[in-house]
Design a protein with these regions (language model features):
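Hydrophobic core
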Residues: 9-17, 197
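Glycine-rich phosphate/pyrophosphate-binding loop and the adjoining helix
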Residues: 166-200
Length: 200
């Protein structure tokens, strides 16, 4: 009997059945975000953007894949210059390009979309992303950082644009909190995910 078990194990190992069982299940949740480092309002000069920190917390709690919208042409690092560029993009309804594409888009059922609120608006580069992919049948969940404007009108704007998706209630966290209070932000995220009925 022991010889038979040993023989079966040898065959299993040689045929690669064990590695097949050991493969990780592909994630069905994706966190996509745009974030800006450098000089930020109310937090000074930072190495990692506020929304990036928030997005990574969400990805960790949801065991999700993560994709950062990295602009082809970088935004200025100083606040006033970045303000000028963003204002001009809003005025002209620009669609800034970003680096790379999302692989296996169809495997994701749930997509978190993160961004800072820039002068009352979603940054235009996020529109570039939202207009590039088919969200039909997906669940979309916005999240954002801000310094007093909350979600502004971003929830409504996303609902109006992504009509084929189910858009759940988003979460807005002050950028200063996301930047400096990881524990508090993690608690906010956990409570929010529970409220909108997502397992963690």
């Amino acid at each position: 009997m022991k010889k038979l078990v040993s023989l079966i194990l040898t065959v299993v190992l040689l045929t690669g059945i064990v590695p097949a069982f050991a493969e990780e299940t592909p994630a069905h949740v994706l966190v996509v975000y745009f974030s800006h480092a450098g000089e930020n309002y109310n937090v000074g000069v930072i190495e990692e953007g506020n929304t990036a920190k928030m997005g990574k917390i969400i990805a960790e709690q949801m065991n999700a894949d993560i994709f950062e919208l990295v602009p082809v042409v970088e935004y200025p690092m100083d606040y006033d210059s970045c303000l000028d560029v963003a204002t001009e993009e809003q005025r002209t309804d620009a669609r800034p390009e970003y680096v790379d594409e999302i692989e296996n888009w169809d495997q994701y059922d749930t997509v978190f979309i993160g961004y800072p609120i820039w002068w009352g608006e979603i940054p235009n580069i996020v529109y570039t992303f939202m207009e590039a992919y088919d969200f039909t049948g997906k669940t979309v969940i916005p999240f954002n950082t801000h310094e007093g404007s909350g979600q502004a009108r971003s929830q409504r704007d996303i609902e109006e644009l992504l009509t084929g998706a189910t858009v759940l209630k988003g979460l807005a966290v002050r950028g200063s909190k996301a930047q400096n209070d990881a524990e508090g932000t993690s608690a906010d995220v956990a409570n929010w995910l529970k409220q909108i009925g997502l397992p963690q």
